[in-house]
């Protein structure tokens, strides 16, 4: 990637003019058009204003028949001069009044944000050009609005494509209460009608005549039993930068925001630049803060950086950080297939060799051993053979893509099938383990028997009481994994690195906190939930919130 920042020779791949990977970015306000751009694509003509000739408003003299004695010529000349002078004075006074009036009169909508929407055009394969509202030369036509990908700004600087902006329209509590007793189908119909009214009114206020929502999904794409995309349909392919995961397959993928690049950069002058990340680029294994510093050095300290979500929202980096510290860096890394694992030594998959009768009427403690270690060093052991045959699947746990949590094979296979398949092939386990499961009652009993805390000890993950005092003294925070619980206090069957609890400012489960001799709120006590953001599209006829609002999380 080539930011070409001052004092920085590294490159950031941008889809903007002047960068190594260019999208032929066109500033619509600063370039003349001839109807076709350099790529041969038709330009949106936004400069079609014409001069209107001024017309003099002088009236012709009124002719009246002379029925009386002829007036004295001097008197007539005097009266004519007086009338002409008086008319000119009145006209001058009116013109001055109008000049003063229009010189001071603001245009309708002058108090709206000048960057409340961005229009994006596709100028080639993996190439895009964006223009903010204030940089448009001429108001686009209805067809031109609908041919673009329209991005709407919310109250904290995130930008939403049409279907997601429509989805975020709030239903007033009073209306929701009225609809509560209706059949679900009728509820949905009434809610849609209300949102559509708000949508159309908001577009009229913004001056946008193209109002298509583009919410229709591709009817040729079948969903799984949970109404989610099947693994083979969860990705779109770019020409140069690999695959990108998406959450929905829209009929109009461009207008719905699915094809947009990874990063949107908005300068203080409201110029728009786009950028992709890819494996081995100039920011490989570098943190987002370094990228941010280079971009702001190049474009200005008030430059905004938006990172695309899998749903298609361009999230402001400061907004992401206000919710989860380090989340902007994690997303920045994911674009290039990197992760931000706190402990890169965790085994990719383990099998629990504990929970066996101890010969004294009890059970041995949990002891999760690296599957790779077993297969490499004990290839002929009964445990190794059983694992190869797909047995012991309910004792196996696998590492998630982020490298910071373990989960069951079936859970990972469902949530991240691509990573699951790669991991199982890597360690030599059959993917059929991901299609096994117990009845819920059995599954939750097993979760409840799990150790509250396990720690990394070479190729093992062991319970705290099994560690010697010396090892406990050497224990690092990044070696500790916590058995997670949901909001109801139930075990989820997953383990998460305690450093993630700290990063996310999460409350520790009480049993884990007791073992670690830490208060449950050690990490969560300082957490302050950010103010909810004003949606990108809202009903101007009512107050969004009755309570006073403080500053937004990023003052945008």
Swiss-Prot record:
Compositionally biased region (Basic and acidic residues): 52-73, 539-548
S-S bridge residues: none
Keywords: Crown gall tumor, DNA-binding, Host nucleus, Plasmid, Secreted, Virulence
Ranges for region Disordered: 1-95, 527-556
Coiled-coil regions listed in the entry: none
GO MF, any single term: identical protein binding
Entry GO CC: extracellular region; host cell nucleus
Superkingdom, natural source: Bacteria
Keyword Mitochondrion: no
InterPro entries the record matches: VirE2
Compositionally biased intervals (Polar residues): 10-25, 36-51
Cell location: Secreted; Host nucleus
Inducing stimuli: Targeted to degradation by the host proteasome by VBF and Agrobacterium virF in SCF(VBF) and SCF(COI1) E3 ubiquitin ligase complexes after mediating T-DNA translocation to the nucleus.
One GO biological process term: DNA-mediated transformation
NCBIfam families: PRK13868.1
Function: Involved in DNA transformation; mediates the nuclear uptake of single-stranded DNA copies of the transferred DNA (T-DNA) element. Binds single-stranded but not double-stranded DNA regardless of nucleotide sequence composition.
Protein name (Swiss-Prot/TrEMBL): Single-strand DNA-binding protein
Native species: Agrobacterium fabrum (strain C58 / ATCC 33970) (Agrobacterium tumefaciens (strain C58))
């Amino acid at each position: 990637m080539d930011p070409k920042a001052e004092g920085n020779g590294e490159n950031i791949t941008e889809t903007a003019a002047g960068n190594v990977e260019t999208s032929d970015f066109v500033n619509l306000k600063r370039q003349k058009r001839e109807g076709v751009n350099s790529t041969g694509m038709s330009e949106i003509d936004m400069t079609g204003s014409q001069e209107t000739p001024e017309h003099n408003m002088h009236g012709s003299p009124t002719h009246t028949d002379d029925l009386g004695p002829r007036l004295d010529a001097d008197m007539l000349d005097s009266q004519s001069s007086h009338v002409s002078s008086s008319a000119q004075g009145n006209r001058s006074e009116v013109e001055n009044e109008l000049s003063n009036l229009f010189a001071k009169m603001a245009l309708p909508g002058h108090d709206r944000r000048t960057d409340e929407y961005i229009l994006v055009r596709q100028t080639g394969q993996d190439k895009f050009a964006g223009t903010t509202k204030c940089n448009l030369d001429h108001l686009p036509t209805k067809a031109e609005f609908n041919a673009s990908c329209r991005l709407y700004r919310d109250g904290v600087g995130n930008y939403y494509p049409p279907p997601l902006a429509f989805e975020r329209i709030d239903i007033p509590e009073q209306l929701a209460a009225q609809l509560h007793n209706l059949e679900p189908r009728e509820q949905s119909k009434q809610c849609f009608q209300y949102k559509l009214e708000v949508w159309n009114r908001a577009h009229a206020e913004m001056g946008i005549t193209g109002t298509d929502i583009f919410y229709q999904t591709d009817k040729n794409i079948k969903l799984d039993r949970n109404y989610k995309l099947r693994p083979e349909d969860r990705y779109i392919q770019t020409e140069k930068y690999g695959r990108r995961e998406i959450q929905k397959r829209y009929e109009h993928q461009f207008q719905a925001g699915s094809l947009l690049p990874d990063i949107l950069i908005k300068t203080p002058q409201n110029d728009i630049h786009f950028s992709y990340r890819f494996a081995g680029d100039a920011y490989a294994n570098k943190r987002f803060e370094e990228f941010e510093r280079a971009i702001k050095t190049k474009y200005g300290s008030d430059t905004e950086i938006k990172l695309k979500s899998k749903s298609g929202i361009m999230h402001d980096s400061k907004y992401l950080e206000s919710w989860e510290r380090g989340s902007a860096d994690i997303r920045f890394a994911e674009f290039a297939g990197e992760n931000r694992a706190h402990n890169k030594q965790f085994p990719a998959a383990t099998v629990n060799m504990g929970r066996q009768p101890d010969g004294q009427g009890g059970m041995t403690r949990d002891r999760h051993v690296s599957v790779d270690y077993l297969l490499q060093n004990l290839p002929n052991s009964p445990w190794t053979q059983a694992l190869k045959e797909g047995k012991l699947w309910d004792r196996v746990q696998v590492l998630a893509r982020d490298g910071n949590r373990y989960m069951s094979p079936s859970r990972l296979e469902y949530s991240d099938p691509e990573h699951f398949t790669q991991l199982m092939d890597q360690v030599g386990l059959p993917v059929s383990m991901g299609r096994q499961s117990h009845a819920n009652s059995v599954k939750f009993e097993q979760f409840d028997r799990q150790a509250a805390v396990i720690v990394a000890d070479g190729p093992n993950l062991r319970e705290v009481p099994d560690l010697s005092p010396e090892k406990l003294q050497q224990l690092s925070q990044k070696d500790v994994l916590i058995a997670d619980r949901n909001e109801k206090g139930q075990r989820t069957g997953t383990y998460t690195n305690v450093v993630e609890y700290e990063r996310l400012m999460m409350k520790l489960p009480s049993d884990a906190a007791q073992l670690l001799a830490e208060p449950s709120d050690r990490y969560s006590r300082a957490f302050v939930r950010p103010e909810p953001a004003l949606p990108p599209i809202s009903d101007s006829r009512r107050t969004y919130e009755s309570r006073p609002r403080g500053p937004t999380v990023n003052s945008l």
